[in-house]
């Protein structure tokens, strides 16, 4: 009789745990998760075929909407709202499933970033990092850190972007993801350059190129070429630009390469060649900054050759584009400064929350151990 009572005492919590979701439709999500890394389109198709989602348990519903959001994000489906991923964040916030909790907050950040809500995106990304040390999904951590770094660079707060971008490089290195490292190193190099560390920027781009293999990313070659031109390494810069041009897929992507190539020819006193590429930028580049760069270099050439009327005309065109760019940047800067102070408040609050959560977890663990000791002691006392 006593043995039966002991058995029931052990069995009751097991039955209670296993009853979660009882009476609800259950789904095996493993096939979807296996498809997600390489075939997110197939994963999305499977998820969309699931019917009666309202009959899912709360746990399965959270898992479903997390996977659905991930598949949509990876297949570039336009996000309209964060209401579905909120079902996942609300559920996982109450659990100890750290990786899914972090992933849910990350995708909530991604959606809000796409919806042009950078303040909310930053908040959710930082929430995803609250228990960073205990998460081993380096692909997820790399994306979170890289996105936070990117948001800081948009604000031109480069010193705050730097540590997150360094973490992103390390996360992708731990994962042995070469292309992840390439993109993270490129972004890190840009930040180093904006902070005035040209040597560090060169090293980042050199490392990125060494990791590429056959998967050429033209922008890295172009940016390294620009850095080499500053150091008068013109022959090396020319080789990099040729590689960049040979690997461009979209026609409009050639203009940033043309701008650097025009600057190289100008430095090398090959004025006709310089004018050809710079004029193409001034007339046809889709981005105002690239057009402005072409006009500025052409203006400098005209002044050097004492072509005063041409120089005046180019100067007028350049200043017109520059003024419109500066007005846009000033408006953006005001928004960014306001956001930056808000980000600081959020970051401080979330780091305090992380510390509090860590302390609470410690006390919770102690209380669980204490309860187990008391339970075992009670069982042995009862048996005796």
Where in this protein do the model-derived segments appear?
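Residue signature of alpha-solenoid helical repeat architecture, marking inter-repeat boundaries
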Residues: 22, 57-61, 99, 139, ...
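Alpha-helical solenoid scaffolds that mediate protein-protein interactions
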Residues: 43, 49-50, 88, 95, ...
């Amino acid at each position: 009789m006593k043995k039966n009572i002991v058995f029931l005492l052990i069995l009751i919590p097991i039955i209670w745990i296993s009853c979660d979701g009882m009476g609800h439709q259950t789904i095996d999500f493993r096939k979807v998760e296996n498809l997600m890394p390489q075939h997110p389109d197939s994963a999305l198709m499977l998820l969309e075929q699931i019917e009666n989602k309202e009959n899912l348990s709360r746990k399965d519903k959270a898992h479903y909407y997390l996977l659905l959001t991930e598949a949509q994000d990876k297949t570039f489906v336009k996000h309209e709202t964060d209401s579905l991923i909120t079902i996942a964040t609300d559920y996982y916030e109450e659990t100890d499933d750290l990786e899914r909790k972090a992933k849910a907050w990350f995708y909530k950040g991604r959606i809000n970033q796409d919806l042009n809500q950078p303040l909310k995106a930053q908040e959710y990304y930082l929430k995803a990092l609250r228990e960073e040390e205990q998460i081993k999904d380096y692909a997820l951590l790399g994306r979170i850190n890289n996105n936070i770094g990117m948001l800081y660079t948009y604000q031109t707060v480069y010193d705050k972007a730097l540590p997150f971008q360094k973490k992103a490089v390390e996360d992708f290195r731990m994962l042995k993801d070469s292309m992840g490292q390439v993109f993270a190193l490129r972004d890190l190099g840009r930040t180093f350059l904006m902070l005035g560390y040209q040597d560090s920027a060169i090293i980042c781009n050199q490392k990125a190129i060494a990791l590429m293999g056959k998967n050429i990313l033209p922008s890295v070659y172009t940016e390294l070429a620009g850095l080499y031109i500053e150091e008068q390494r013109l022959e090396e810069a020319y080789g990099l630009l040729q590689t960049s041009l040979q690997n461009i897929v979209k026609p409009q992507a050639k203009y940033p390469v043309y701008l650097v190539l025009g600057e190289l020819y100008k430095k090398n006193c090959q004025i006709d060649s310089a004018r050809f590429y710079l004029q193409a930028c001034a007339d046809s580049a889709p981005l105002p900054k690239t057009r402005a760069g072409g006009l500025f270099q052409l203006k400098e050439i005209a002044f050097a050759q004492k072509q005063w009327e041409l120089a005046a005309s180019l100067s007028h065109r350049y200043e017109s584009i520059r003024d419109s760019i500066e007005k846009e940047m000033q408006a953006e800067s005001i928004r960014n400064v306001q956001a930056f102070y808000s980000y600081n408040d959020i970051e401080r609050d979330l780091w305090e929350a992380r510390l509090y959560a860590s302390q609470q977890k410690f006390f919770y663990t102690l209380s669980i151990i204490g309860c187990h000791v008391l339970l075992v002691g009670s069982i042995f006392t009862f048996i005796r």
